[in-house]
Amino acid sequence: MKFFDDLEIRTKEKRASDLAAALPLQLIHARDHTKTYREILSEFDLSKVTSLASLSSLPITRKSSISQAQKSAPPFGGYTVGTSSNFEHIFQSPGPIYEPGQTSNDWWRLGRFIHALGIGNNDIVQNCFSYHMTPAGMMFENGVKTVGATVFPAGIGQSELQVRAASDIGVTAIQGHLIF
């Protein structure tokens, strides 16, 4: 099996070097372009956060904090760059928390994972994650499309129809919860 991309064949030293370069830039971008991370990260010298060890010195953002911030500043609580009109989707996950979503360029970053499973352009993947309100269905569909496979957006439930569809269309992989 070939690698998803060259990131997978980096040496340990190259991974650490890449992280040291990218991590502070990403944190500075979050601080400089989002209201909430500006508040959370304002007292830290983010240029010195260049490793996993130094990242652990920053405060953890908890789901309950996101939910509370979103009540005060709907829909995303000041955690995103831009407004809701910058995104193709808005999802609601338990909490509730609202999450933005896109469908292009492996936005959810699951392509590498799907590729590691051996799924590729000759596969038909039956996506049994829900497409209703939560992001799981779209997240996995996006990853499957990234590796060139075909998606059957089955969602959840209706086990007899699920089994028939898998047989009728030649499904080669199933992802999701197999509790129908």
Regions found by a protein language model. Name each.
Residues 99-112, 126-180:
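AMP-binding/adenylate-forming
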